[in-house]
Structure formats: C-alpha cells, structure tokens
Amino acid sequence: MIMTQSNDRMSKNDYYLSIAMQVLERSTCLRRQYGAVIVKADEIIATGYNGSPRGMENCSDRGFCYRNLKNIPSGQGYEDVHCSVHAEQNAIISAGRSKCIGATLYLVGYDSSKQESHGWIKEPAPCSICMRMIINAGISKLILGLPEE
C-alpha cells in the first residue's frame, strides 16, 4: 500500500492483525491455521502459530490430520489429543507471563472449508484452554478477526 494521504495509514489493529496473518503461514496444521501476535506498549513481544509440540512430527510432514482420522470434531477432545499446540499457547509460552501482563493478543484463523469467506475465519475464538491461559498470562485485551482493509 502506498500512502497518498495521512488518513490512508493502516490502523494499529489492522497492522498487527496483518502480521498475525503472516504468522499463520508457518502453521503445520492441515485442518486450520491460526496466527497470534502479542503486543505490549506498541511492541511485538511474541508470535505463535498452531502446530505439533516441539520435537513431534507435524501433520504437514505426516501428510494427514490425526483429528480428522479419528473423526474428532472441532472444539472437542483437546485434553485427549496431544498433537497440537494452539497459536495463542505458543505465543504466551514464547513471551512468558511477565511480558504478557497488560498486553493485547491479536488472533486470526484460516479454514479452507469455509468457502464463503475465502477460508478466513471472521471471528476466531480461543478455546476454553487457551482462554484460561490468556487470563492467567495477564493479557488484558483480545483482538480477533481480520484487518478491516
């Protein structure tokens, strides 16, 4: 985007959501991709994307999704299936709690089965486990969705 007037400048929320869209490109999940950015005092303190725990084989490397193979519905079975760490979790782990206190978490999601929105999840919602982590980390604000542009 080339600015022609001062009011053409991208908002900070759109800026950080756009970065989260780039972060999700690193996701190794075949089902859905998420990107998270944690910002404090206008500084990015951590990013995260969803994928297998460190050292474990990724679905993208395996060529199949374990959750799909076992017919586990979206939003269920997180406690029983240890094949994924969510974007929000990875970002919080990378930042550490002391940096997260009072921060804002930006989250975007993509699901290729959602054809009506070209795959973008308009209102991605953290799961109950991620919400507990967000609360315990001291994150004070969530910005969910897509940039307005």
Please report, for each region that a protein language model flagged, where it lies by residue:
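Short glycine/serine- and small hydrophobic-enriched flexible loop segments
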Residues: 22-25, 40, 93-96
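Short, Lys/Arg-enriched N-terminal segments with co-localized hydrophobic residues
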Residues: 1-2
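Zn2+-dependent cytidine deaminase-like catalytic core
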Residues: 8-11, 17, 45-149
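Short beta-strand scaffold segments in enzyme catalytic cores
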Residues: 33-48
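Short, basic/aromatic recognition patches
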Residues: 5-33
